[in-house]
Amino acid sequence: DESIKEMISKWSKQNLIQNLEHVRDGEGEFVDFRGKISNHELTEPINLIGLIDSKKGTIRANHYHPQQEQKCLFTKGQIIEVFQDILNPNSPKITQVVNEGQLSIIKPNVAHTMVFSKDTTFLNLVRGEREHNNYGVTHTIKHIFVDEAEKDLLLSCYKFNCRCCGNKNLKRVVSLGYQ
């Protein structure tokens, strides 16, 4: 029992994400009776914006980008994002929730899958070419690591807010198979 507690404690203190992927809220918000303005600073030029609509209960991605950093600004909905460093054979699968209004930034060579827990709309912001004919060749390489059974398991078991206070910003803890 002590060795398991020690292992869980050690794992819980590791920063497993290591800047592979991170989620940010908008900054410098302005709110009045008309609504809200939220700003997201981008650190590199963007030459392509894709508008993507996805239905609740579906999967997108299951791929990685060998050179491009991908930024996704979620305007509606929610996803469970699953990602893994493909350059590190010991890298665990890591999950996190991305909510409406948040920006997800995914580094090159990070396999990622989006499991849609709600009907979702997001802007895909990239630098570089994204010709559909080059899918699997230059900008996006298929890497299936979340199948339909795993998607269903995530959707049925994932907790999106605290059962006590309703907070949506839950801290990830060690679980079997995921971080």
Model-identified regions with their sequence ranges:
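N-terminal juxtadomain amphipathic helix
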Residues: C157-Q179
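Double-stranded beta-helix
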Residues: M7, N19, V23-D25, P89-P92, ...
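Short acidic-glycine-tyrosine-enriched beta hairpin
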Residues: I86-P108
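Short beta-strand His + acidic residue motifs that chelate non-heme Fe in jelly-roll/DSBH
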Residues: N62, E81-V82, I106, A111-S117, ...
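His/acidic/aromatic-lined binding-pocket segments of jelly-roll/cupin-type domains
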Residues: H63, E69-F74, Q96, S104, ...
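Glycine- and acidic-residue-biased ligand/ion/polar-headgroup-sensing regions
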Residues: Q67-I86
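Conserved short histidine dyad/triad with adjacent acidic residue
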Residues: G50-Q68
